[in-house]
């Protein structure tokens, strides 16, 4: 069974950039719901497999993708953030960003624009294309997980569902994007990058 991961910091730790009320609801209610619904869906899926009921298996696919994706995405998201975050990455990750996007500022602009431009709910991602050995920016709708839908390995995800920012930034998604760069945990993103290069 899947369980809700603990946050590596307090709900109020990312203030003033993301307030405690948002973090508490986002983690203890939204992410928890994905975990619970994923467990229920997997149980039903196992039953359908045991019965050889292919129709039921197919009918459960959207719930599996939505709740499984929600759990995968948020588990990455919490570690991508830190009260000691912000600034720029160092070392190999920074070199790769410069190589693939021209400069850190251009990368930031591109990921911001991609995330702001998501229609409705979804995510903006920095991913690693293992075949090409390059970094890539992508957007995924709803809770579609990056790797499961594009093959890119997720390094940095920006949640642009309204529940991630509305209580603080209302409908002004660009202000939320501007703020989130102050709490990006580049150490975590770098660890993910180094791991997929092995």
From Swiss-Prot:
Assembly, per entry: Homotetramer.
Modified residues (3'-nitrotyrosine): 34
Native source species: Hylobates lar
Role this protein plays: Destroys superoxide anion radicals which are normally produced within the cells and which are toxic to biological systems.
Residues with PTM N6-acetyllysine: 44, 51, 90, 98, 106, 178
Protein name: Superoxide dismutase [Mn], mitochondrial
Alphabetical list of InterPro entries matching this protein: Fe/Mn_Superoxide_Dismutase, Mn/Fe_SOD, Mn/Fe_SOD_BS, Mn/Fe_SOD_C, Mn/Fe_SOD_N, Mn/Fe_SOD_N_sf, SOD_C_sf
Cofactor: how bound: Binds 1 Mn(2+) ion per subunit.
Keywords attached to this entry: Acetylation, Manganese, Metal-binding, Mitochondrion, Nitration, Oxidoreductase, Ubl conjugation
Residues engaged in binding Mn(2+): 26, 74, 159, 163
């Amino acid at each position: 069974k899947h369980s809700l991961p603990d946050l590596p910091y307090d709900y109020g730790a990312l203030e003033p950039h993301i307030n405690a009320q948002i973090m508490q609801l986002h983690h203890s209610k939204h992410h928890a719901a994905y975990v619970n619904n994923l467990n229920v869906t997997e149980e039903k899926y196992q039953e359908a497999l045991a019965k050889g009921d292919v129709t039921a298996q197919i009918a459960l696919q959207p719930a599996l993708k939505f709740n499984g994706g929600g759990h995968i995405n948020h588990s990455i998201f919490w570690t991508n953030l830190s009260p000691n975050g912000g600034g720029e990455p160092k070392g190999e990750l920074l070199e790769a960003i410069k190589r693939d996007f021209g400069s850190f500022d251009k990368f930031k602009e591109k990921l911001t624009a991609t995330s702001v431009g998501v229609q409705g709910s979804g995510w903006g991602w920095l991913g690693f294309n293992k075949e090409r050995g390059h970094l890539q920016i992508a957007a995924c709708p709803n809770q579609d997980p990056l790797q499961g839908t594009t093959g890119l390995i997720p390094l940095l995800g920006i949640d642009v569902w309204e529940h991630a920012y509305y209580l603080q930034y209302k409908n002004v998604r660009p202000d939320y994007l501007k703020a989130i760069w102050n709490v990006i945990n580049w150490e975590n993103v770098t660890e993910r990058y180094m791991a997929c290069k092995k």
